[in-house]
Amino acid sequence: MRRALSLLARLPRLLLIGLVRLYQLVLSPHLGRTCRFHPTCSAYAIQAFREYGALKGLVLTVHRLLRCHPWGGHGYDPPRWFDEEHPAADGRPQAAEEQ
């Protein structure tokens, strides 16, 4: 019973990851590399869903997609919730307000 409940709780996250994987396999090869960030937006989405679950991961993914345009940012941008510290590109901790 516990195992079934655990799978049911993870199901939304797994479905969203599956949709991103489908995009990576079907559409992404035809669009070419257009993402300005590292990791790419689709890899970011998968990481966000794995680390934060379906709801927070979806919020982070939409926020990232809205920032990924020619006049937006670029560079290293790992998934992190809005009030968390995150490592700089060189691996040292860096608070969000320091950027």
From Swiss-Prot:
Keywords: Cell inner membrane, Cell membrane, Membrane
Annotated TM spans: none
Short name of one Pfam family: YidD
Membrane topology type: Peripheral membrane protein
InterPro entries: Membr_insert_effic_factor_YidD
UniProt subcellular location: Cell inner membrane
Keyword ATP-binding: no
Highest taxon of source: Bacteria
A GO term from the CC aspect: plasma membrane
Major location category of this protein: membrane
NCBIfam families attached to this UniProt entry: membrane protein insertion efficiency factor YidD
Function, in words: Could be involved in insertion of integral membrane proteins into the membrane.
Similarity-based family: Belongs to the UPF0161 family.
Stated name of the protein: Putative membrane protein insertion efficiency factor
Organism, as annotated: Salinibacter ruber (strain DSM 13855 / M31)
